[in-house]
Amino acid sequence: MFWIYADSTYTVIFFYRDEAPKPTVALEYTFGRRAKGHNIAKDVGHIWELGGGTWLSKLMDIPLNPSTLLHTTLVLVLDLSAPNEMWFTMETLMTAARARIDSCILEMKADDSKIKEKLHKKAWERVGEDHPDKNMLDPMLIPLVIIGTKFDVFQDMDSEKRKVITKTLRFVSHVYGASLQFFSIKQEQLISKTRGLISHHLFETTASKTLQTDYNKPLQVPAGLDSLQQIGNPPLSEQDIGRVHAKNPMELWKVAFTGFFPQENTNNPGTVKDPAKDAQFAEPSIDKLRMQKDGVCYSFTFKQTHLYE
């Protein structure tokens, strides 16, 4: 399983660990085990987490590779309280993930020339081969889960904003053949539901078929159970729809969403918290040298700045 744009909150909760969640720095690995009945042997689930901003998306090449692709579920974590970053984050990471998957498939074709067709078949089995929206869908070739976090903050937002965000995420999830789940670390019921969803993908436990699409409540939409008719039109007036030049429905929804929530670029390393200053990575001897070096740099910069005053 591969989480992108995540922090350790989710693995700490999922594995019932008694520790404080910490921000994920770049790419991190952890694992969990689950007992198999009365057997001594346990199932092992491998989890990679990518954090630190969209500019690190190239690191997904490590966990997503030809040897792991057939056993990988992609989990995209989106912050519901930050809609002005949501589309940019989602689009950047999904584009990178799809490109990496295509690259892996090219390598895998050397051993199995029909690997892409097999993955397509599995994708449609997840969504439903007879789904009425089939001609409008473009499911990911590996299982995809989209988790909207900070529902506790989101539920206090303006109702119109919540409606736009929920409809848009339902549309994107539906087109990509993803399961959609809203989550809050402060609500035990949502923790339990998210834990069940992750357990299904990690250990093949029974999946919940509960469908919740009311924008006033936390969304829970299993892959293939939504429909374009139920989602409705993008949040644009009929007059605006006629003026928008979009190549496909996804672009139309992008125009609608970004018109409502102008996007901020999160692809800047400068906006990411410096892990070197994080207490969890403290190294006294190295930190002392770093302080000395920073002091020298500051002194030099100060002198250069005031040289011609």
Predicted regions and their residues:
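TRAFAC-class small GTPase G-domain
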Residues: M1-S179, S184-K193, I198, G270-Q280, ...
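Eukaryote-biased recognition of long, low-complexity, charge-rich segments
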Residues: F203-K273
